[in-house]
A protein has these predicted regions:
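Phosphate-backbone binding interfaces of nucleic-acid-interacting proteins
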Residues: 1-218, 353, 376, 386-387, ...
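Terminal amphipathic helices with adjacent charged low-complexity linkers/tails
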Residues: 202-228, 405-433, 440
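A carboxyl-terminal module marker
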Residues: 2, 452-455, 602-605, 610-611, ...
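Beta-rich nucleic-acid/ligand-interaction surfaces
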Residues: 40-44, 214-216, 501-506, 530-549, ...
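Extended, well-folded interaction surfaces typified by the phenylalanyl-tRNA synthetase beta subunit core
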Residues: 193, 426-588, 722, 775-777, ...
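Glycine/proline-enriched, intrinsically flexible loops and inter-domain linkers
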Residues: 5, 11, 24, 64, ...
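Conserved mixed alpha/beta core segments that line enzyme active sites in large multi-domain catalysts
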Residues: 50-78, 162, 256, 267, ...
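Mobile "lid/hinge" segments at catalytic clefts and subdomain interfaces of large enzymes
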Residues: 128-133, 137-139, 153-154, 167, ...
Length: 808
C-alpha cells in the first residue's frame, strides 16, 4: 500500500513532521512503513520561468539563446531542446537557477544518488545562467506526465505563477510511503484508513472527506433494477447512474495524487473511480448504461464451461463458482475482477451505470487463480471489504463527478443489502488489558485511544462498540493490542515473567521414535524423508491385489497433481523411490531409514483416518536378510522388549520375494514384516541389486515397550559356550531351531546366536548348513560338563526329530 504524505495531511490538519519522524511513529504504532521516497529529494532552486524571446546561437545550429523571466530577474539560458524554437515566446517552463539541483538527466536513465548540480557556464561561447528542465530531469517520467514531450522541455500550464516553485506546481513536493499492511487490517488498504491511523498516532484531528448529497430530482430506481441471486457471494450491491457524460482530463491535483499511488491518469471518469478506490479502498466499476439489456443487473454464478470475453479481449472459460455481473440477457462482467468487452466504455458514452459492491473475498481469490487474471480491484476484494463502505464510496464518486462537471448525477441509489452487518460489541475490561500487557494504563487513557480509532463506548453496558471497518477486533487480546499500540510498545516496562517454570519433556511415543532413529543410525542407516502424498498407480507397481485394504485411501481434494493425489497407506513407495535414486546415481551399499507416517482410511468417510508411524528400513549392497533381522532385534532390545521376536515365513506380502519374507511377531502379536524385495518390483523401480525392506509398526510396539531398567550385579561365575553346526532343509526356517534351543535350554540358558549360514557345493542339494553359539550360566556356581551335557543332548534329540542332521 502506497500513500502520499500530502494526501494524508489533507485529512490530518496540523500534521507537521519530517519524513523519518512519520515513518518511525507510524511503525511504532503498528502501521509499519517499509520505505519512503521523497519526490523532491534532489530538486532545489527550481522555479516557474516564462520565455520572453528565443534567438539563434551564433556558433551552433542546434542551440538557441533564451531570455527567461524567473520572477526576480530575467536570465539568459542556452538550450538545445527541440521544442524551443526561434521566435517563440510566452511559454512557462520549469527553470533550475544557478547553484540549484535536478534529479537526473534528460535521457530518463537511472537517477544519481545526489542529483546533478547546475552552475552558470558558457555553451559554445555564450553564457547560460541556469537550465530549463524536462520532466525526466525533475525525476519523473512521461508515464505520469503524458503531455510531456519526448526529449524536450516540459511546458507548464498558463496558471503557473512566474517565480513560484515549479516543484510545488507539479506536485513533486511530496513523499510517498510504502506500508506493510497485514491482511487483517483491511481498513488500512485505503488513504482514509492510513490517515485515521496517522491522526491517532500523532494525536491530531481526523477530517475525512465530507460527502454531500448528490443527484438531480430524478429517481435512479426508475432507470435500473438489481437482483442478487448469489446472496452468499455478494452481501451488498449499490448502483447509481450518471447522464450526459463529459469526458475531459481530470484536474492537476487529482492527477498528482493518482501518480503518487502509481496510477496513470486517463480521463476524469476513469480517474475518479481510481481515486475513490485509493481513497476509500472500495473498487468501483462503470458500465455503458445503454448496453445494459433491460436496464437490469443480475448477480449470479456462471454455469460450468460458460464463455466470457473480458475487457482485455481474452475469452475465458468459467466454472459454477465464478460470480458474474449480468444484465437482462448476458454477462457483462466477472464480479470484482474485470468487466466485459460487451459493456466497455467508449469515448461516445452518454450515460454510465456505476457499481460499488461487496463480494466474497475467498471466492474472488479462487476465481483469479482459476482464470489467471488478477487486477487492482480483485486485490482489494480478496481481503474482504466492509459492506458499509460501498454507499459512502459511490456517493463520493458522484460528488466528484458533480464537482468536476463530468456528468449529471441521477438522484438516489439502488441499494440491495439483504443482510446488513451490525457493529460488534466487546466488554470493556481494562484490568484484563493491563494484566496482559504488564502496564498500568488508566481507564480514561484507554478510552481516549479508542475514541481516536472511532471505537465507541457504551457506558451503561460497559461495552466497546467496534466499527464495521475494524474486522480484526474480535476478542480481549485484540483490544489489548490497540492499547499497547498507542500507549507505545517502547513505553511498556521490561519485567521478568512471574510464576513457576516447568521443564518440558518428550512423550513416550516420541521416545520410541527417538530410539528407532538411534538404532538405525548406530547400525549405519541414513535418514530419509519422503512425501506423504502419492499416486494410486503405486499400488500396481507394488503388485497389491485389487481388494487389498491398502488400496483404500484418503483422497486429496486439491492435489498438486495425480502423483500426489492420495495419502499413502504404505511407507514402501517413498523408500523404494529414494533407493532407486541412489542406485541410479551409482551409490553403493545404501542403507536408509524413515519414520514414515501412513494414513489408513476409516470405513466412515466422516471419520478421520488412522495415522500410524512406521519405522521403515531399506537397503541394498553389503546387507542381507539376517543383518536386517539383527536391526529389528537391536531396536526391540533398546525399547525394553527383551524376548526374541518370532518370524512367520508365510507372510504373503506381494511386493516381497515369496521365499524370503516373514511377518515379525512379539508375544504372538504382529509388529511388522521383513523381506527381500520382489524381483519384479525391483525392476519397476529400476533397482538392479537385491534390496531388503523392514517395516515395524510404532504404535503396536509402543504398547509393549518399557524404558524401566532393572539393574543386576555382575555375574560371579563364568559362562560356558557350546557351538553346534547342523544341516537342515532349505525350506525349514532357522526359527524352528531357536524354538528348540529355548525350550530345552532350561534355566541355565543365557543366550544363543546364529553366526553362520552356508549353502554350496559341499552341502547336498536342497539343504543348508547352519551354526549357532549357545551360552550357559548359573547364578550360584560354575557349570561343569555334567550340567551342560544333558541339556545339549535334549537339544540334539529334538533337532534330529525334526529332520536336522548334526555336523560333527
Amino acid at each position: 500500500m502506497n500513500t502520499s504524505l500530502n494526501w494524508i495531511k489533507a485529512m490530518v490538519p496540523g500534521l507537521e513532521c519530517t519524513d523519518q519522524e512519520f515513518r518511525d511513529a507510524m511503525t511504532l504504532s503498528g502501521t509499519k512503513v517499509e520505505c519512503f521516497n521523497a519526490f523532491d529529494k534532489n530538486l532545489d532552486k527550481i522555479v516557474v520561468g516564462q520565455i520572453l524571446s528565443v534567438e539563434r546561437h551564433p556558433d551552433a545550429d542546434k542551440l538557441v539563446i533564451c531570455q527567461v523571466n524567473v520572477g526576480s530577474e530575467n536570465v539568459q539560458i542556452v538550450t538545445g531542446a527541440p521544442n524551443i524554437e526561434v521566435g517563440s515566446s510566452g511559454q512557462k517552463v520549469p527553470v533550475v537557477l544557478d547553484g540549484g539541483k535536478v534529479a537526473g538527466g534528460h535521457d530518463g536513465g537511472a537517477l544519481p544518488e545526489d542529483g546533478i548540480k547546475i552552475k552558470k557556464g558558457k555553451l559554445r561561447g555564450v553564457e547560460s545562467c541556469g537550465m530549463m528542465c524536462s520532466i525526466e530531469e525533475l525525476g519523473s517520467s512521461r508515464e505520469f506526465f503524458p503531455d510531456a514531450p519526448e526529449g524536450g522541455i516540459y511546458i507548464l500550464g498558463d496558471d503557473a505563477v512566474v517565480g513560484s516553485s515549479a516543484v510545488e506546481y507539479l506536485g513533486l513536493n511530496d513523499t510517498v510511503f510504502e506500508y506493510e499492511i497485514t491482511n487483517n487490517r483491511v481498513d488500512c488498504y485505503s488513504v482514509i484508513g492510513i490517515a485515521r491511523e496517522a491522526a491517532a498516532t500523532f494525536r491530531k484531528p481526523f477530517n475525512p472527506p465530507v460527502v454531500t448529497k448528490t443527484g438531480n430530482d430524478e429517481d435512479v430506481n426508475t432507470m435500473v433494477s438489481v437482483d442478487i441471486e448469489a446472496k452468499e457471494l455478494c452481501s451488498r450491491y449499490v448502483a447509481r447512474v450518471v447522464k450526459n457524460i463529459r469526458l475531459a482530463p481530470s484536474p492537476k491535483w487529482m492527477q498528482q495524487r493518482l501518480m503518487t499511488a502509481g496510477i496513470r491518469p486517463i480521463n476524469n471518469i476513469v480517474d475518479i473511480t481510481n481515486y475513490v478506490m485509493e481513497e476509500y479502498g472500495q473498487p468501483m466499476h462503470a458500465y455503458d448504461y445503454d448496453t445494459i439489456a433491460g436496464h437490469k443487473i443480475v448477480v449470479r454464478t456462471a454455469t460450468d464451461g460458460e464463455k466470457f470475453v473480458t475487457l482485455d479481449g481474452q475469452e475465458r472459460t468459467l466454472d459454477a463458482q465464478t460470480l458474474l455481473i449480468c444484465d437482462g440477457e448476458k454477462p457483462v462482467g466477472i464480479a470484482g475482477i474485470m468487466g466485459g468487452e460487451n459493456s466497455m466504455i467508449t469515448d461516445d458514452v452518454q450515460t454510465m451505470l456505476f457499481e460499488a459492491a461487496t463480494f466474497d473475498g475467498t471466492n474472488i481469490r479462487k476465481t483469479t487463480k482459476k482464470i489467471g487474471l488478477r487486477t487492482d480491484a480483485s486485490g482489494k476484494f480478496e481481503k474482504g471489504l466492509d459492506p458499509e463502505n460501498a454507499m459512502e464510496a459511490i456517493n463520493r464518486a458522484c460528488q466528484l463527478i458533480e464537482e468536476l462537471d463530468a456528468g449529471d448525477v441521477v438522484g438516489g441509489a439502488v441499494d440491495v443489502y439483504p443482510d446488513p452487518v451490525t457493529k460488534k460489541r466487546l466488554p470493556f475490561e481494562p484490568a484484563k488489558y493491563n494484566a496482559l500487557l504488564g502496564t498500568d494504563v488508566s481507564d480514561e487513557e484507554m478510552l481516549s485511544y479508542f475514541e481516536r480509532l472511532e471505537v465507541e463506548y457504551d457506558k451503561d453496558a460497559n461495552e466497546l462498540i467496534i466499527p464495521t471497518f475494524r474486522q480484526d477486533l474480535n476478542r480481549d487480546a485484540d483490544i489489548a493490542e490497540e492499547v499497547a499500540r498507542f500507549f507505545g510498545y517502547d513505553n511498556i516496562p521490561t519485567t521478568l515473567p512471574k510464576g513457576e517454570t516447568t521443564m518440558g519433556k518428550i512423550s513416550f511415543e516420541q521416545s520410541i521414535e527417538d530410539a528407532a532413529s538411534e538404532v538405525a543410525q548406530f547400525t549405519g542407516f541414513s535418514q530419509a524423508m519422503t512425501y506423504s502424498f502419492e499416486s494410486p498407480k503405486v499400488f500396481d507397481k507394488l503388485k497389491l491385489q485389487a481388494d487389498s485394504v491398502y488400496r483404500k485411501t484418503v483422497v486429496i481434494s486439491n492435489p498438486l497433481g495425480e502423483d500426489f493425489s492420495v495419502m499413502r497407506t504404505l511407507p514402501i513407495h517413498g523408500m523404494l523411490t529414494s533407493l532407486s535414486t541412489n542406485y541410479n546415481r551409482r551409490n553403493k551399499n545404501v542403507k536408509l531409514y524413515e519414520l514414515a507416517k501412513v494414513y489408513l482410511a476409516a470405513d466412515d468417510v466422516n471419520e478421520l483416518p488412522d495415522e500410524r508411524v512406521e519405522f521403515t528400513l531399506g537397503a541394498f549392497g553389503s546387507v542381507d536378510f539376517y543383518s536386517m533381522k539383527g536391526v529389528i532385534e537391536e531396536f526391540l532390545e533398546k525399547i525394553g522388549m527383551k524376548k526374541k521376536p518370532t518370524y512367520d515365513a508365510k507372510a504373503g506380502i506381494p511386493f516381497l520375494h515369496p521365499g524370503r519374507q516373514a511377518d515379525v511377531y512379539y508375544d504372538d502379536k504382529k509388529i511388522g514384516y521383513i523381506g527381500e524385495l520382489h524381483p519384479d518390483v525391483a525392476d519397476s523401480y529400476s533397482i538392479g541389486e537385491r534390496t531388503y525392506i523392514v517395516v515395524i509398526d510404532i504404535p503396536t510396539v509402543t504398547e509393549m515397550a518399557s524404558f524401566d531398567k532393572k539393574f543386576t550385579g555382575i555375574a560371579k561365575f563364568p559362562a560356558v559356550t557350546r557351538d553346534i553346526s547342523m544341516v537342515m532343509p532349505k525350506e525349514l526356517p532357522v526359527g524352528e531351531v531357536e524354538k528348540i534351543i529355548e525350550k530345552r535350554g532350561g534355566k541355565i540358558l543365557e543366550s544363543y546366536n546364529l553366526f553362520d549360514i552356508y549353502e554350496g557345493s559341499q552341502i547336498k542339494e536342497g539343504f543348508k548348513s547352519v551354526a549357532y553359539s549357545i551360552a550357559f550360566r548359573a547364578k550360584d556356581r560354575t557349570l561343569e560338563d555334567k550340567d551342560i551335557t544333558p541339556v545339549m543332548e535334549k537339544i540334539f534329540k529334538d533337532l534330529e526329530a525334526d529332520g536336522i542332521e548334526l555336523r560333527k
